[in-house]
């Protein structure tokens, strides 16, 4: 198993990063939240999980070991593959998923693309004794609410966009962030900002 990759960020895409390790570019699938912490040309270290299939080897990257562990635990539930597990972590931080499972919060799980009401109920049953109790801060996105503009702007600059483009994209998604109330999700805002920029080009 490849436990982590450490090296220079050679490229960034909406759903992946390329980390140069010893002259080799390692393509790593990441959530928008993880990608928002990376900068082109800067050193980075990502916890990783290698998913082996008959026709492919896919490396998934995470901000820390806890996120990777939750990613792997999610896949122990029937019907959850690496893509759905990553989608769950793109919408919710590890502690938010633990809290959702611990409290039986179907709505939190159905917020993930690909999970319906019945699927959420099944996951709540299967994951109840696997994820454990929340271990971190009390609320998902709580530290993000005041600084989402700075985080989103930095993420867009890290993806190679000009300062002017980043400014315009941040302004374009501001109504969406305000509609989310006190806990805007930077990952979701990054996706919306990238769509805005792609339409403008």
From Swiss-Prot:
Its main location: cytoplasm. Residues 1-63 are annotated as: Domain I. It comes from the Bacteria. Residues 139-143 are annotated as: Flexible linker. InterPro entries: DNA_helicase_Holl-junc_RuvA_I (IPR013849), Hlx-hairpin-Hlx_DNA-bd_motif (IPR003583), NA-bd_OB-fold (IPR012340), RuvA (IPR000085), RuvA_2-like (IPR010994), RuvA_C (IPR011114), RuvA_C_sf (IPR036267). The keyword Oxidoreductase does not apply. It is found in: Cytoplasm. Has three domains with a flexible linker between the domains II and III and assumes an 'L' shape. Domain III is highly mobile and contacts RuvB. The RuvA-RuvB-RuvC complex processes Holliday junction (HJ) DNA during genetic recombination and DNA repair, while the RuvA-RuvB complex plays an important role in the rescue of blocked DNA replication forks via replication fork reversal (RFR). RuvA specifically binds to HJ cruciform DNA, conferring on it an open structure. The RuvB hexamer acts as an ATP-dependent pump, pulling dsDNA into and through the RuvAB complex. HJ branch migration allows RuvC to scan DNA until it finds its consensus sequence, where it cleaves and resolves the cruciform DNA. Belongs to the RuvA family. Homotetramer. Forms an RuvA(8)-RuvB(12)-Holliday junction (HJ) complex. HJ DNA is sandwiched between 2 RuvA tetramers; dsDNA enters through RuvA and exits via RuvB. An RuvB hexamer assembles on each DNA strand where it exits the tetramer. Each RuvB hexamer is contacted by two RuvA subunits (via domain III) on 2 adjacent RuvB subunits; this complex drives branch migration. In the full resolvosome a probable DNA-RuvA(4)-RuvB(12)-RuvC(2) complex forms which resolves the HJ. This is Holliday junction branch migration complex subunit RuvA. It comes from Streptomyces coelicolor (strain ATCC BAA-471 / A3(2) / M145).
